[in-house]
Amino acid sequence: MGKEYFLKVALREAKRAFEKGEVPVGAIIVKEGEIISKAHNSVEELKDPTAHAEMLAIKEACRRLNTKYLEGCELYVTLEPCIMCSYALVLSRIEKVIFSALDKKHGGVVSVFNILDEPTLNHRVKWEYYPLEEASELLSEFFKKLRNNII
Ligand SMILES: [Zn+2]
């Protein structure tokens, strides 16, 4: 199973967030080809500003693997991680992050900040932007509805 497959699983999570009126971002963590956690943005539901999809996916993966480090794991997420999530990925020692839309306003990987390329950090997370039109479309649709007060 390739990147596109995993990004589409993450996209299904993003759609679940959309249905709940959350900013539609979904994330999954994969280890050796197996999905070990899935999450979607739950800031509204949990009343928690840090409940981004990536944070929830990291926590769930650590619980499942009973470890604080996610070495050898990859995170697939529908939107470029923000600064908080990028640094959480560094702390988790995850191997790589793959994202399918850019966040021009808050991106922590390449669009605004470059947290993962920071040479002073003691763990280097590899990253890849793998564009998926559906991922950006879902976000545009959400913000359009928000502007028109449909959500
Ligand atoms: Zn985030």
UniProtKB/Swiss-Prot annotation:
Q: What GO biological process, any one, is recorded here?
A: tRNA wobble adenosine to inosine editing
Q: Which reaction does it catalyse?
A: adenosine(34) in tRNA + H2O + H(+) = inosine(34) in tRNA + NH4(+)
Cofactor field:
Zn(2+)
Tell me if Metal-binding is a UniProt keyword of this record: yes
Q: Which residues bind Zn(2+)?
A: 52, 82, 85
UniProt keyword list: Hydrolase, Metal-binding, tRNA processing, Zinc
Q: Name one GO molecular function term.
A: tRNA-specific adenosine-34 deaminase activity
Comment on bound cofactor: Binds 1 zinc ion per subunit.
Q: What family is this?
A: Belongs to the cytidine and deoxycytidylate deaminase family.
Subunit structure comment from the entry: Homodimer.
The name this protein goes by in its record: tRNA-specific adenosine deaminase
From which organism does this entry originate? Aquifex aeolicus (strain VF5)
Gene designation per UniProt? tadA
